[in-house]
């Protein structure tokens, strides 16, 4: 019997690894990306490349303009993207309810195509300030999924997977390399240019670069300038 999984795919390093993990577990993968008004829209081109390279059965990009709400440095040009490392509290790069919105879209698609597994790249190590990247959030969303759907209330339960939630960036990279992920296809930078070249100074770039160093793997990231 075919097992189908919906995988949230941003085009970044973490979600590419999660897509490879879902495939390695024998799932037929359906990749879901969202054009939500993010600064770094070149990540969607990266998502297309990654979905093709990792053999996703389908890849859908949903338009939902969260820039109309603002509230995040990723969707509001008046808020600066931080470049000075981790800060106390919830980072300004947190997009209000983004994971909940995207998981809900994934849940609807999963029920429509007969999938019962949702995968996403939540990580509580690098992004410990994000409320929707915590283990208790993952557990709570799985409970919601099974309360809010026809399949769930009929006993055909959904499972929400966050396989990299406790992994360091170096561990994630090593796992992805073992599964054949080509990280040169990915874009992680919050301020990547239209060609997908990274700024080299934002927090996401800093974490990504440190991850490749920790993994002992050459960094394939293309930078806008020496950084």
UniProtKB/Swiss-Prot annotation:
Domain of life: Bacteria
Pfam annotation, one family: QueC
EC number: 6.3.4.20
InterPro entries linked: QueC, Rossmann-like_a/b/a_fold
Family of this protein: Belongs to the QueC family.
Function: Catalyzes the ATP-dependent conversion of 7-carboxy-7-deazaguanine (CDG) to 7-cyano-7-deazaguanine (preQ(0)).
Listed name of the protein: 7-cyano-7-deazaguanine synthase
Organism field: Cupriavidus necator (strain ATCC 17699 / DSM 428 / KCTC 22496 / NCIMB 10442 / H16 / Stanier 337) (Ralstonia eutropha)
Lineage of source species: Bacteria, Pseudomonadati, Pseudomonadota, Betaproteobacteria, Burkholderiales
Gene this chain is encoded by: queC
């Amino acid at each position: 019997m075919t097992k189908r999984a919906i995988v949230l795919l941003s085009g970044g390093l973490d979600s590419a690894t999660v897509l490879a993990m879902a495939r390695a577990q024998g799932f037929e993968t359906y990749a879901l990306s969202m054009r939500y008004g993010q600064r770094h829209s070149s990540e969607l081109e990266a998502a297309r490349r990654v979905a093709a390279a990792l053999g996703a059965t389908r890849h859908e990009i949903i338009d939902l303009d969260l820039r109309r709400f603002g509230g995040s440095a990723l969707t509001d040009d008046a808020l600066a993207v931080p470049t000075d490392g981790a800060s106390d509290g919830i980072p300004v790069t947190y997009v209000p309810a983004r994971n909940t919105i995207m998981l809900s879209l994934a849940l609807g698609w999963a029920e429509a195509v007969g999938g019962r597994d949702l995968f996403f790249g939540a990580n509580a190590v690098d992004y410990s300030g994000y409320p929707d990247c915590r283990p208790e959030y993952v557990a709570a969303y799985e409970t919601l999924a099974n309360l809010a759907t026809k399949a769930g209330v009929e006993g055909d339960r959904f499972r929400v997977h966050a396989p990299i939630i406790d992994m360091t960036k170096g561990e994630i990279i090593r796992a992805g390399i073992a599964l054949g992920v080509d990280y040169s296809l990915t874009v992680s930078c919050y301020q990547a240019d239209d060609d997908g070249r990274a700024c080299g100074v934002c927090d996401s770039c800093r974490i990504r670069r440190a991850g490749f160093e920790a993994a002992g793997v050459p960094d394939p990231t293309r930078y806008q300038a020496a950084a």
